[in-house]
Amino acid sequence: MFKNLRLLGFFHFFFIGEFMSHYFRNDPNLISEETTYQVEMFDQKFTFLSDKGVFSKDHLDTGSYALIANLDIPTHAKILLDVGSGIGVIGIILKKVHPNLDVTQIDINTRALELNIKNNKLNQVETTVYESNLFSHVDKTFDCIVSNPPIRTGKATIYNLYKDAYKHLNTYGQL
C-alpha cells in the first residue's frame, strides 16, 4: 500500500509538477491562450483578459470575491497596495469603486502584469503596475495593503508578506 503511495507521489511530481506552470513563477515558454471573463460587483460589470500561467485564469476565485466584497477601505486611505495582484482584478475593482484612491499593484509574474496593464485600459482605470517579488521593489508606504496571498508558495512566503507589510504601512495603515 505505501509503495503505491510513493509511486503516486513520484508520478505527481515527475509528470505533473515538472510540467505544470505555476502562477507565482514566470514561464516564458508557456504558450499564450488569452481569454476573457466577466465580473459583476457593486452594480458594475468588469471584463478581464486572462491567460494560461496566471492565477484563477477563467473566473474570479471565491477568496478574491469575498475579499473585495468585504473589504472596508478606511476613510483616511489615499494610497493602496495590492500585493500579488495577478491580472489586476482586486486593484482594478477597488480603483473603480474608490476613484480617488491611488492604487499600486505588484506581482512577480510578468504575464500577469502585462494582462493587468491591458485590464486597466479595458476597465478604464489607471493604477500603477510593476514587478516585485513581495516588497523587494517597493519603496513607498501605504494607507492600506491588500492581498489574496499565493498560498501555494508555502508558509515562509506568506509569513514574509505579513512581516514586511508592516514596514510599508503608514501610521494607522491597515493590512
Question: Can you annotate each of these PLM segments?
Answer:
Residues 51-68:
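Conserved SAM-binding loop and adjacent beta-strand
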Residues 1-10:
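Positively charged N-terminal leader segments that act as targeting/secretion signals
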Residues 173-175:
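Conserved beta-strand signature within the Rossmann-like core of class I S-adenosyl-L-methionine
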